[in-house]
């Protein structure tokens, strides 16, 4: 994972949930030393729990069964004392205004987590750039970098570049 190259041994980061974020957490837990992952995802915490390279801090809150994440005001209380360099987030969709989510509570929780990070990095499959969500997550200007596959539509890449968002692609044939 190209996004894993941005994380160093001994670093503390935040990771929200989603398939790409889970793969990142697995890569870090397997191939980095002393990485602390702060997450609201019970799935990610459980998925990497036996890996010796990662220390997990699971943020508490209201549990959403389908996505296995914690949301709501308790997450805000839990995350308040932290500040990290990077927050890694997935997305459900994209439009000319930015990134989108399909769940209001989850979007609000992600924005709270983003307030405690110097940089926001999106990890997503390129197909999400052809889909929309029901609520706004971030304007693309609030996102430092996007990691996706090489199928990203050129219009989306141009919008991101115009907003000073770095776009990193990997071959979709991998």
Please identify what each model-predicted range represents.
Residues 23:
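N-terminal active-site wall of soluble small-molecule enzyme domains
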Residues 40:
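Short beta->alpha hinge that forms the Motif I/post-I loop of the SAM-binding pocket
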């Amino acid at each position: 994972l190209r996004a894993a190259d941005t994380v160093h041994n001994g670093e503390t980061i935040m990771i929200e949930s989603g398939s790409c974020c889970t793969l990142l957490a697995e890569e870090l837990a397997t191939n980095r030393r002393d990485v602390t992952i702060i997450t609201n995802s019970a799935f990610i915490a459980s998925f990497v729990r036996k890996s010796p390279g990662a220390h997990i801090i699971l943020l508490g809150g209201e549990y959403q069964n389908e996505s296995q994440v914690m949301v709501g005001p308790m997450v805000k209380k839990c995350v308040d004392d932290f500040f990290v360099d990077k927050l890694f987030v997935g997305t459900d969709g994209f439009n000319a205004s930015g990134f989108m989510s399909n769940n209001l509570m989850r979007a609000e929780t992600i924005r709270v987590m983003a307030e405690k990070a110097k940089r926001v990095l999106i990890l997503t499959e390129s197909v999400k750039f052809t889909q929309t969500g029901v609520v706004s997550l971030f304007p693309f200007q609030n996102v430092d970098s996007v990691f996706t596959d090489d199928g990203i539509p050129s219009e989306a890449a141009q919008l991101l570049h115009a907003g000073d968002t770095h776009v990193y692609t990997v071959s979709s044939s991998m």
